[in-house]
């Protein structure tokens, strides 16, 4: 009887050892390698009959963002250009995200690289405006990034519609 008990105990130990050595195969994590495109557009008629137009296209891939922003006021020179930067996770308070980008803008025949913050979510987007200062290398940054004023609210649209509005 003692022999059988020892034999069962040895078999259980060997079985436990073999089972613990099994390799766990994890499924590979597949990252989305195709960007998500979001587009926004606004047109606001001024008292003089001229319209302020703004449109935005963003391509999101993880926490990176690229795109184009065009701000075309009715009575001032337009400011247009491409950008790239990072995008935050969803802020549960505002139910939106913030893109912090470097905008290569063109206005009045001059090209300037400047900081641009864009909030978006819940079907709209707004660009942040505030006093800008040269950080010493020709790149402009917000003097007080916590005191921005957000401009015209752009509504989400199909990206093909934005291209038609150019």
Write out the residue ranges for each language-model feature.
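Beta-sheet ligand-binding and adhesion/scaffold domains
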Residues: 64-66, 93-166
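Hydrophobic single-pass membrane-insertion segments
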Residues: 17-26
């Amino acid at each position: 009887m003692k022999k059988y008990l020892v034999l069962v105990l040895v078999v259980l130990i060997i079985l436990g050892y073999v089972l613990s050595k099994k390799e766990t195969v994890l499924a590979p994590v597949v990252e989305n390698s195709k960007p998500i495109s979001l587009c926004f557009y606004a047109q606001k008629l001024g008292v003089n009959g001229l319209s302020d137009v703004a449109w935005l296209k963003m391509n999101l891939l993880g926490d990176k963002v690229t795109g184009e922003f065009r701000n075309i006021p009715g009575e001032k020179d337009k400011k247009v250009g491409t950008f790239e930067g990072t995008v935050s996770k969803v802020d549960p308070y505002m139910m939106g995200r913030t893109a912090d980008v470097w905008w290569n803008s063109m206005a009045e025949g001059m090209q300037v690289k400047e900081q641009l913050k864009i909030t978006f979510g819940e079907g709209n987007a707004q660009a942040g405006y505030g006093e800008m200062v040269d950080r010493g290398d020709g790149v402009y940054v917000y003097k007080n990034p916590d005191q921005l004023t957000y401009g015209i609210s752009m509504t989400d649209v199909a990206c093909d519609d934005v291209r038609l509005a150019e």
